[in-house]
Amino acid sequence: MTTEGQDDSSKEEFTNRINKQKGRISSEFIEETKYLSQSQKDSWNENGFILIPNFYPKSKCEEINQTVIDIVRSMVDNSEEFNHAYIDDGHIGIREMKPPIKIENIEDEMSKVFRLHQKGIFNEFINREDLLDMLQDILGENIDCFLSQFIFKNPGAWGQPWHQDSSYFPFDRAPQVGAWLATSPATEENGCLVILPGSHKEPLHEHLPDDRPGSNYGYTEIKDHDFS
C-alpha cells in the first residue's frame, strides 16, 4: 500500500470498477532468482519492495526533470485554453485540482504526466540492462511496460491517500511491478512515497473515493485498515 472538480457520480463509477476485484491478491512471491541478491529477494518477499540507493546518476535525474518541464510547457503552449488535462505529442498532463502553495510556472501546478516511456531518456531508463535483469527475476522473460508517469509532488499538493496500485490495473496477467525512481531527494520534507511493509501479502481492500475537497480525479483511499 502506498500514499501520496470531480462530481460524486464519476467517483462512484470509478471506485465500483476497482472494487469488483476486491479479494484478489495484490502481489506474488518469488522463489528462484538469477540477478537479485538474497537480501533483495528476501526484502521483496517479506516487505513487498526492493530499495536500491543511487541506482541512476544524479545528472540523468536532472535531465529527466528538465525534460518533463519542457514537455509540460510545450503542452500548454500548444493548448488553446486553460485546462485541467492536456494532451500533446502522445503525452497526457494532469493539473492539480487543489493549487499548490507557490505557483511561478506551469510545472508548479502539475500533478502527473503520463506516457513518457516511448521516447528519449525515459525509454533509455526502462531499457537499462540491470533494471530488466531484476524485473526478469520477478516477472519472467516476457516484460512489457504498459504505463509510465512522472509525479510532481509540488509543495502544498494533496498527494494521494493510502491505496494499492494493483486496484487500478484489473489485468488477468499477473504479476505487475512498479519501478519507481526518485529524481529528487526522497525525504519526508519533500513528500516522499510511503509504503506499508508486508501489505503486499494482503488481498485487495475496498477503495473509496478520496473525499478531501479538491482531490484529483481517480484518487481513492483504503479506509478498512489501521495504518497507525
Residue ranges and their predicted role:
Residues G120-N123, S166-F169, L181-S184, D226-S228:
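Short helix-to-loop capping/linker segments positioned immediately adjacent to catalytic or ligand/cofactor-binding
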